[in-house]
Curated annotation (Swiss-Prot):
Consequence recorded when altering residue 51 to A: Decreases interaction with CSN complex. Abolishes interaction with CSN complex
GO cellular component, one term: nucleus
Top-level taxonomic group: Eukaryota
Protein name: COP9 signalosome complex subunit 9
Signal sequence extent: none
Modified residues (Phosphothreonine): 26
Organism (species): Homo sapiens
Nucleus as UniProt keyword: yes
Claim: Cell division is one of the keywords in the record: no
Amino acid sequence: MKPAVDEMFPEGAGPYVDLDEAGGSTGLLMDLAANEKAVHADFFNDFEDLFDDDDIQ
């Protein structure tokens, strides 16, 4: 017997959206772009210049 979805995910479906419900992949991309983006408060952005090719030897 396979577990039902509500048994596998008792807290609900979460932020996931079925492609058919989102109106296809284009609608899903628009939904993703419209959502607010957040970064963890203690994320330390210490990246050097990733695209700096002058330091390649």
